[in-house]
Every structure is written in C-alpha cells, then in structure tokens.
Design a protein with these regions (language model features):
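Bacterial N-terminal signal peptides
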Residues: 11-22
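Alpha-carbonic anhydrase
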Residues: 2-7, 27-270
C-alpha cells in the first residue's frame, strides 16, 4: 500500500513539474481577456525534431529519463483484446476556461469549472479534468491509420492517478467549440491568455463514446511520465480544413513518433 501511494505521489510530482496536469485555480475576476507572458515549466528545453527531438529526450535531463521507459505513448493500435470494460461517463459542464496557452509546443487550455468540477468516471475512479490540448496530425495510429488531428483531454484523481482521453479529429464539418478556442488562442509563442470564454468540453466529444481502446502508457511529451491510463475513442469528430490549417500555421507537426508496445495489452470495449 505504501509503495502504491509513493508511486502515485511520484507520478503527480513529475507531471506537475512539467506543467502537464495543473490542478485548476479559480480565474481572476475580469471584464475582458488579458494576455500575459507564459513561463515555461520545463527547466530543459526540448523539441519534436533535431538535437532536442524525441530520440534525445531521455538524455536531455535526468528528469526526462522516463522518456526511455518501456510503457511510452503514443502507440499504433493494431492487436487488441476484447474486454467487458465499464462505460466511460463524462460529467462535463459549461464553465470558464482558465487559460488558453501557446506554450511553444501546442495550444493548451487549462480548464476550470466552479462547484464540483468536471470529471471522467471509469468504474470506481473519478478523474477531474485539468487541461486539454491538441496535436497535428494525431499522435495515435489506429491499425496504421493516422488522423488529421487529435484532442487530448487530461484528468487526474485526488490520489494523483492520471487518465487521458484521445479524441480523434478528421477533416469535415467545422466544430463550433474548436472554433471558439481558435478565436481566443494566442498567435504568439509564449503567451498566456486569461480567457473570458465559457465552454463545455462535452461539445468536443463524439456522440458515441461507448466504443474505445484502453491501454497503459505515458505523457507524450517530457518528462514522459508513465502510469497514465489512456482511452482512445473509436469515433472521431470533424473539424474543417480551415480549422486544421489555422492550427497548422502555428504547429504544423507537434507529434511524438509511436512507441513500442513492449508486450502491453490494448483492451477494446465489447
């Protein structure tokens, strides 16, 4: 029991150190949106390519050692094991976004909702939504297929357990919620926008969330913390070609290559 608690605290500490799972704070009262400098949480800079790219992450900083681990993400979902998995329950509500951040690697939204907050419920576990961000193209492959983009909704329990929900995005009709975020995202790297926008993250979920893949993996950027439960929804949502292009102007390729499974089992809901 003590080792489990220590491990959970270690996962939480490592994730917090990288700014990937910030527990939301209530936003300041404000009459209009404000832009502030963004202070990077990464002590050692990294990138997706070149001398600081994925192949070198594990050597850039001792804090990034997990990037050389055996349970890394993303993966190519090919062989799966059918399982009677619990339904995913999304207890999402309309609430104010805390920050819309251009952090030099992606557009990330720190989410805050008053009251009980917004939760992903899986079995007996309740994971609170802390932030979401985007990648282009998708980091995940499904049987060799990559999608135009992916949305990662990141959640955490009080004990520090982390769960990510991957929503695959494909070109098609425009998504109103995504457009609202695009209309408020800072165009300049290193900007942190205090948002006056209210949003329900459920508006970025597909109508069908019953079918999904599940596996144990990691954060997909340094420090690559392992112990993350990933849920990859089978049904994609659509975004317009213009919305994809708008993101691509900032981040044309913010993806980590797929990582070896190393014997991990990918479960598929029946």
């Amino acid at each position: 029991m003590r080792s489990n608690i220590r491990y959970a605290l270690w996962v939480r500490a490592a994730a917090l150190a990288a700014g990937m799972f910030l527990v939301p704070q209530a936003p300041r009262a404000q009459s209009a949106e404000q832009v502030h400098p963004y202070v990077s949480p990464w002590k050692t800079p990294w990138d997706y390519e070149g001398a600081r790219g994925n192949d070198h992450w594990g050597d850039l900083d001792p804090a990034y050692a997990a990037c050389k681990g055996k349970e890394q993400s993303p993966i190519d979902i090919r062989r799966t094991q059918k399982a009677a998995l619990p339904a995913l329950r999304f207890e999402y509500h309309t609430g104010p976004l805390q920050y819309v951040i251009n952090n030099g690697h992606t557009i990330r939204v720190n989410y805050y909702a008053p009251g009980s907050g917004d939760f992903l419920v899986f079995g007996d576990e309740r994971y609170q939504l802390t932030q979401f961000h985007f990648h282009r193209p998708s980091e995940e492959y499904v049987r060799g297929k990559r999608y135009d983009m992916v949305l990662h909704l990141m959640h955490e329990t009080r004990e520090g357990k982390v769960a990510g929900v991957a929503v695959l995005l494909k070109a098609g009709a425009a998504n109103r919620a995504v457009q609202e975020i695009w209309d408020h995202m800072p165009a300049t790297e290193g900007q942190n926008l205090v948002s006056a926008l209210d949003l329900n993250p459920a508006s970025m979920l597909p109508d069908d969330t019953a079918d999904y893949y599940m596996y144990m993996g990691s954060v997909t950027a340094p420090p690559c913390t392992e112990g993350v439960t990933w849920f990859v929804l089978k049904t994609p949502i659509t975004v317009s070609a213009e919305q994809i292009s708008a993101f691509a102007k900032l981040y044309p390729h913010d993806v980590r290559p797929v990582q070896p499974l190393n014997g991990r089992i990918v479960k598929e809901s029946k």
